[in-house]
């Protein structure tokens, strides 16, 4: 087993609840999910989000592995908001203009893949943004995801980003309070990305599955305190493995 295979194994153990011990004093994930449900209902009531189609109940046959006591299975659509970029005809090169005080940045796949918001120099006018693209604006804390070709690469938009929108090759995600972002992304990397690749359409160019499939994907939710313990332990082990890999490379060079 090489270092990369070992890292993947660590992630598999982590998301199955086999990497850190469970604590019976932790507030169970069912309580957390009830709070998320209430938060979602309030946002719908305030008309900040639209009520979506009810997702199907999770069957035993769907569950890919057994989870510990206190954990819960949910579907992606139950724990966050997801929005794909505009149709291709909404943003084309003919609409791009030089950067100025009257422009809005258009974020691209490379921003997610290379995890750098400063890349790229495509802009549209504020007038066009207000008329056609306002719903695709990204904010600090949003997760952007590459959706075509190199799919599933994620990037959390940091403080100080330039005001902008996602293009047609990106999706943005907002996860509810109570789901640790680092845990979510770790799960996304280990399970959801590979699932998305397997179920994506096309052979030459892979794409994130349609939303009706994507939102039905399963997500294992530990108690919030355990999420933090898992992330901490994974970070600790990954840092050690990175150092080990460097040592092996240096020994091979010598």
Where are each of the predicted segments found?
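A short glycine-rich beta-alpha junction/loop motif
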Residues: 147, 163-171, 202-221
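Extended, domain-scale alpha-helical bundle/helix-rich regions
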Residues: 2, 6-62
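Short, ligand-facing micro-motifs at secondary-structure edges
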Residues: 88-91, 112-124, 143-166, 181-186, ...
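Non-catalytic DNA-recognition/assembly elements of restriction-modification systems
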Residues: 9, 13, 18, 61-89, ...
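Structural signal for hydrophobic
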Residues: 71, 154, 216-217, 227
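Short, well-ordered loop/turn sites that connect or cap secondary structure elements
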Residues: 137-139
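Short alpha-helix capping/helix-loop boundary micro-motifs
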Residues: 127-132
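Low-complexity, Lys/Gly-biased intrinsically disordered segments
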Residues: 58, 72-115, 133
């Amino acid at each position: 087993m090489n270092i990369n295979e070992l890292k993947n194994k660590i992630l598999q153990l982590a998301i199955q609840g086999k990497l850190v011990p469970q604590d019976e004093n932790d507030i169970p994930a069912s309580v957390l999910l009830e709070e998320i449900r209430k938060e979602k209902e309030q946002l719908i009531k305030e008309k900040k989000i639209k009520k979506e189609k009810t997702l199907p109940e999770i069957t035993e046959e769907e569950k890919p592995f057994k989870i510990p006591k206190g954990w819960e299975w949910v579907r992606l659509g139950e724990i966050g908001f997801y929005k794909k970029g505009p149709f291709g005809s909404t943003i084309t090169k003919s609409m791009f203009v030089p950067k100025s005080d009257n422009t809005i940045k258009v974020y691209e796949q490379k921003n997610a893949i290379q995890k750098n918001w400063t890349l790229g120099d495509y802009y549209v006018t504020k007038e066009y943004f207000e008329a056609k693209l306002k719903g695709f604006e990204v904010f600090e804390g949003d997760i952007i995801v590459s959706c075509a070709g190199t799919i599933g690469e994620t990037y959390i938009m940091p403080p100080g980003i330039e005001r902008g929108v996602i293009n047609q090759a990106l999706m943005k995600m907002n996860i509810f309070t109570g789901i640790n972002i680092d845990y979510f992304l770790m799960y996304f990397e280990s399970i959801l990305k590979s699932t998305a690749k397997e179920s994506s359409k096309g052979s030459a160019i892979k794409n994130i599955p349609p939303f009706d499939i994507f939102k039905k994907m399963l997500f294992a939710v530990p108690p919030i305190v355990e999420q933090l313990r898992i992330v901490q332990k994974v970070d600790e082990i990954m840092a050690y493995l990175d150092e080990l890999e460097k040592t092996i490379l240096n020994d091979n060079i010598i």
